Amino acid sequence: MKLTLSWLRDHLDTTALLTEIADALTDLGLEVEDIHDPAARLHAFTLAQVTHAEQHPDADRLRVCRVMTDEGEKQIVCGAPNARAGITVVLAKPGDYVPGIDTTLGVGKIRGVESHGMMASERELELSDEHNGIIELPSGEVGQRFTDWLAANAPEKIDPMIHIKITPNRPDALGVRGIARDLAARGLGTLKPLEIAPVEGGFDSPIGVTIAPDAAERAPHFTGRLIRGVTNGPSPDWLQSRLRAIGLRPISTLVDITNLFTFDLNRPLHVFDAARVHGDLTVRGAAAGESLLALDGKTYDLRAGDLVIADANGPESLAGIMGGEASGVTGATTDVFLESAYWQPIGIAATGRALKINSDARYRFERGVDPAFTRDGLERATRMILDLCGGEASRVVEAGAAPDTSRAYRLDPARTQSLVGMDIPEAQQRATLEALGFVMDGDMAQVPSWRPDVQGEADLIEEIARIASLSRLQGKPLPRPRAGVPLPVLTPLQRREGAARRMAAALGYNECVTYSFIDEASAALFGGGSDAVRIENPISSEMSHLRPDLLPGLLAAAARNQARGFADLALFELGPVFSGGEPGEQTVQLTGLLVGASAPRDAFGSRRPVDVYDAKADAEAILSTIGAPARAQVDRKLDGWWHPGRAGNIALGPNRLATFGEVHPRVLKAMDVKGPAFAFTVHVANVPLPKVKTPTRPALNLSDLQAVERDFAFVVDAGVEALTIVNAAQGADKALIESVRVFDQFAGDKAEAQMGAGKKSVAITARLQPRDKTLTDKDIEAVAAKIVDKVAKATGGTLRS
């Protein structure tokens, strides 16, 4: 955002110096990136008078001039065609730096004639592009500083330009008035009133406006009017100078007025040549195959649904982004239709990004302009057009209505002081909000329509702190810890998160940090995308919702890596996910993703594709690290983004500790990931903390007696899970059975041919560890019988013969 000091003073009655304004802006959060002060580079130049000029003896286009300066008469060789006796000029002496030619002058000889300095043109002093001759001043004293003469006679020539970096959450600061409002609230002046004098139309507009049903949500409000009999010549010097100062090229009065409003009041407008509009204007979605030759000279092929303003012949403008050349105004325009509308930000951002169009209008509409200023902006622009171009205005035509953005939040002065850490009196807090445009009703603050970023009590406090200046905060040392055993710095949950992160890295995963914001389509794939987690002022449409899961970010990272030739991936992320916008609807997860092979190619053939068991083993390893009990069960109550037959939950009763398995192929296709892909999610906070804190671990109690292992093979239904068999066998004798593990499975057509349709064989090893006495064969057989009985009752299976 660029503006000049004089432009700022059109809205702010202030005597503050440029440096004071720049410092205040940065302190307010409106970072000043650069200040271009022409006077700083012109300070050395003085006025002089040419007393005599004659032809150079050895050059047709050069003249030898005698110039009266504050140091006496000097000889200067000049090539300007207007160098002559009697004119007052701007003198650059030897030793002066001339910015336009990037040169420090010295005494030199030009074609054998000595020259002491130069008489400058406007381009050489970077005042304009004029270089056909040296500067001729109508008045001035010899020796007077050129900057003093400019300040008195042409102040716009040395008007400082301020370049400010505006953050996405402050669309109101994309207009000079919004910046002036912040400075006034800080106390650097008084905000001047903005006069809105409605123009009474003298006739009905022959061009009507409508909003098609398919565009109503994206285009809630459209206003316009016809102005006939205008003269569209060059704009006044003050307007041209203002636009040039911020890097814009003056075009014509009508176009320059719309550009002025864009930067002055953050109100983009558009003007149509009424003679080139056929019928009424309709805001609608583009049809497939339509195109538009825009004002930048490029033809854009529109997507179906892109928001356009169309007449009977087709699209005439890309709504909120850029007008069309066919209906653009020219020097011959006499009747103009002026448009002022409010467009929904996300739709503008999506269209602009898809068509790769950047414009000042798009930049503002996609961040959010003031919806309540749509009609007032039209009236104020109409008044300026009538003043500068003449003509007669019609009555306003209007479709839709400005969206209701009214909202109010309670101001708690005590909470403000608590959060900010500064003593800010209640009266000052209220005065600050009122200066920023908030309306106070008791302790409720009504948010102004131009501040879409204010969405809660915390934002009120932020505004108060910003205006009061956080630079006033006094540093306070932290209290010294008391003697003795120090208290833990991290909470139990934070320590658990750290342990989970370290274990994931130890398992070979690479940590990713992805955005917490994702697009609506990706959020919907993972059970999100509701209005409760929609971002009010997203940076882009690809960051419109809070993420419901960590998998979207990891899958997007996998897709980017695959596109760059990295096929074998092991990625993980630990971070928050959001199921809603209320307290308690934010949880912490650790999610890992495996794609490709388990290892690089080697001479031993150890490389194999990753599978669901890798994901399960890694999930169990992390759960074990953070203290999950070993008695967890596996169930199949899965979310829709998991493969229904190749995934499961690790749960403790109804409490889900982790999910592992293959990601659904439908999700992989939508995320452009080459599968299969396997993943796990550990719900870190769901793992119960130990009920009793023990300062030390119990001593390891090893038995001196010989352990015994026995193998069992059970014939069970194909749908029986191995964990069911393991848990049943484990419970046969908890005192003696130390562990049970699966070592073989026989399933498929061959298994069914031997054991019957729908059957499979699962083989387990049970390890028996006596504590009191050596086991006899009778003892072992008794335990084996219990194992067979328990498994039979749990699964309906039989011991395989």
Task: Label each region the model flagged.
Residues 111-126, 130-136, 143, 149, ...:
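Mobile "lid/hinge" segments at catalytic clefts and subdomain interfaces of large enzymes
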Residues 5, 23, 28, 63, ...:
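Glycine/proline-enriched, intrinsically flexible loops and inter-domain linkers
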Residues 47-75, 240-241, 258-326:
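Conserved mixed alpha/beta core segments that line enzyme active sites in large multi-domain catalysts
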Residues 183, 187-214, 389-416, 423, ...:
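Terminal amphipathic helices with adjacent charged low-complexity linkers/tails
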Residues 2, 20, 27, 435-437, ...:
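A carboxyl-terminal module marker
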Residues 178, 409-572, 767-769, 774-775, ...:
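Extended, well-folded interaction surfaces typified by the phenylalanyl-tRNA synthetase beta subunit core
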Residues 2-8, 158-167, 220-228, 360-367, ...:
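Short, hydrophobic beta-strand segments
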Residues 1-203, 337, 356, 360, ...:
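Phosphate-backbone binding interfaces of nucleic-acid-interacting proteins
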